[in-house]
Each structure stands twice: as structure tokens, then as C-alpha cells.
A protein has these predicted regions:
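Active-site HxH/HxHxD metal-binding segment of metal-dependent hydrolases
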Residues: 92-179
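Sec-dependent signal peptide recognition
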Residues: 6-13
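Short glycine- and acidic-rich boundary segments immediately preceding or forming the N-terminal edge
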Residues: 28-42
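C-terminal motif of bacterial Sec signal peptides marking the signal peptidase cleavage site
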Residues: 16-19
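Conserved beta-strand hairpin/beta-sheet module of binuclear metal-dependent hydrolase folds
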Residues: 45-96
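N-terminal secretory signal peptides that target proteins for export/translocation
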Residues: 1-5
């Protein structure tokens, strides 16, 4: 038994010395971006699309599209992008088409990329807001309580820590806004 323990110790010591041998550096190669993902980026080209008379959608400015519905005297906006900066850019385009005041803002759901640009679209008017009854609760919770963990997870999920040239798109839009 004693000699068996010595043999095990000796084998462990030999293993330790062998594992401390000179190491080689492995070269890291940049992973290839799949062609389908590159082609998918074409879906998010920045453009203003006229869907039909009086209905326009801004695509590629944020994760969520923003829609203008023209009225005779007032306009309706569906989803307001994820930041004031992007909302300003989209609003300026919409105003070039029809500068009527925004009477109504509709949120399709309570995510930041659909709601955080609302103050820009509401400027100069007091629009009615149409949303699910829980939208205010969820937005308040995200802003006040969950923001650190949501931000951390979103940044990791959408690749915000990667260099810009390594991010092709975010699957549902060009990039995640941090608004």
C-alpha cells in the first residue's frame, strides 16, 4: 500500500513537471461572419418607406421601426425609437413629409426601443398615448429597478462590447440604442 502511494505521488509530480513545460501561443482568428447574416443587414438599410398614401415607416434607424400616419390636421406616431437622438433624426424626416402636430403616440409594447424617443415626438403638443395598461408599470420598473441588469444583459446579448466593425447587426435591427 505504501509503495502504491509513493507511485501515485511520483506520477503526480511527473505530471506537474510535464504540465509546466514551455507553452506555445495559439493564434486567434477572427470568426467569419456568416453570409446570411451579412445579407440580413440589407433589411436594416436606413430608409423612409411610403407604405401607402399617408403611411410612412422609418427603417434602419433603431431596433424598432417608427411609423408616421398622416392626418388632415394632426399626425399619429407608432413607436418612437429608443433614444431622443434617433427620434430627432426620424422626426425631422417625418416633418419634411407632414409637419402637423403629433396628436397620438401608440406603443406596440413596453420595450425601451419603442418608447424612449417619445418626448421628441411630443414636443410642442400634448399627445394622447395609447399603450397596454401595464406599459407605465413596466417602464418604471425597468428604469428604476432593473436597469443595471437589463443593460448588462442587453449589452452582452447585442454585442455592444465588441468593436463596431465586428457587429454586423442585432438580428432585429442595426444596433441597440442605449437611451
Amino acid at each position: 500500500m505504501f509503495s502504491m502511494m509513493r507511485q501515485i505521488k511520483l506520477l503526480l509530480i511527473i505530471q506537474l513537471f510535464l504540465s509546466c513545460s514551455e507553452t506555445t501561443t495559439l493564434e486567434s482568428t477572427k470568426p467569419q461572419t456568416p453570409e446570411d447574416l451579412i445579407a440580413h443587414s440589407d433589411e436594416f438599410k436606413r430608409e423612409l418607406i411610403t407604405v401607402t398614401d399617408g403611411v410612412h415607416v422609418a427603417v434602419g434607424y433603431a431596433l424598432a421601426n417608427s411609423i408616421l400616419i398622416e392626418g388632415e390636421k394632426t399626425n399619429i406616431i407608432i413607436d418612437t425609437t429608443g433614444s431622443e437622438e434617433t427620434a430627432k433624426e426620424v422626426k425631422d424626416m417625418f416633418d419634411a413629409i407632414n409637419s402637423n402636430p403629433v396628436e397620438t403616440i401608440i406603443y406596440t409594447h413596453n420595450h425601451a426601443d419603442h418608447t424612449y424617443g417619445a418626448t421628441v415626438f411630443a414636443e410642442g403638443s400634448n399627445p394622447d398615448i395609447y399603450a397596454h395598461s401595464t406599459t407605465e408599470i413596466y417602464l418604471s420598473r425597468v428604469i428604476g429597478i432593473l436597469r443595471p441588469i437589463i443593460s448588462s444583459r442587453s449589452n452582452r446579448m447585442f454585442g455592444n462590447a465588441l468593436p463596431k466593425e465586428q457587429v454586423e447587426n442585432n438580428g432585429i435591427g442595426p444596433f441597440l440604442e442605449i437611451g
